[in-house]
């Protein structure tokens, strides 16, 4: 059974959560993915499918500022869930607050400024004769200057909407 965004609209999120809790004896798990429009999200969902029953993962909320890409990725994820015969609800949240509210785990995987900013960082560094990749050095420093303020905003939101959530940061620059 595949739970798509359309199906989710028929049952409000809180009602769905209550329904899951009653069926599973109060044990459900929600994961939120901030930056969920990235292509690796589909791989992440595929990995969760292999473990979702064992870990009682029932719900994954995807959020990204690129709504068009997010819609495509959510549909791909729903297809992966359907093909696997899984019962994992994967939906595109309307905003970051909806995504993280009630989450047990939050995964951050965002790229502030998109590929354009990454390319600029790398090209500037290379013109100066140094390695320009986004995880360390000049490129990593530029990336961190753009990324850290936004990550701190998300941390504040998570703290207020999901105070017990664990945060897994896969956002570069991971080396700084």
Ranges and model annotations:
Residues 8-28:
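Short, Lys/Arg-enriched N-terminal segments with co-localized hydrophobic residues
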Residues 104, 111, 172:
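Short glycine-/small-residue-rich Rossmann-like dinucleotide-binding loops
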Residues 116-176:
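Rossmann-fold NAD(P)-binding glycine/threonine-rich loop
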Residues 55-76:
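NAD(P)-binding Rossmann-fold cofactor-contacting core
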Residues 37-41, 67-68, 169-176:
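Gly/Ser/Thr-rich loops at beta-strand to alpha-helix junctions
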Residues 89-102:
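Short acidic low-complexity segments
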């Amino acid at each position: 059974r595949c739970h798509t965004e359309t199906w989710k609209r028929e049952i409000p999120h809180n009602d769905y959560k209550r329904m899951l809790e009653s069926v599973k004896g109060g044990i459900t798990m929600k994961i939120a993915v901030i930056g969920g429009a990235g292509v690796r999200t589909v791989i992440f969902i595929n990995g969760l499918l292999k473990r979702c029953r064992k870990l009682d993962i029932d719900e994954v909320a995807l959020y990204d500022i690129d709504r068009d890409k997010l819609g495509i990725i959510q549909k791909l994820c729903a297809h992966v869930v359907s093909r696997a015969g899984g019962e994992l609800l994967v939906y595109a949240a309307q905003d970051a607050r909806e995504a993280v509210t009630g989450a047990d785990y939050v995964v951050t995987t965002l790229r502030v400024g998109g590929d354009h900013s990454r390319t600029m960082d790398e090209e500037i560094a290379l013109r100066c004769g140094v390695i320009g990749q986004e995880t360390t050095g000049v490129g990593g420093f530029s990336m961190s200057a753009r990324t850290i303020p936004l990550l701190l905003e998300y941390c504040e939101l998570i703290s207020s909407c999901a105070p017990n959530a664990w945060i897994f940061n896969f956002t570069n620059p991971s080396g700084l």
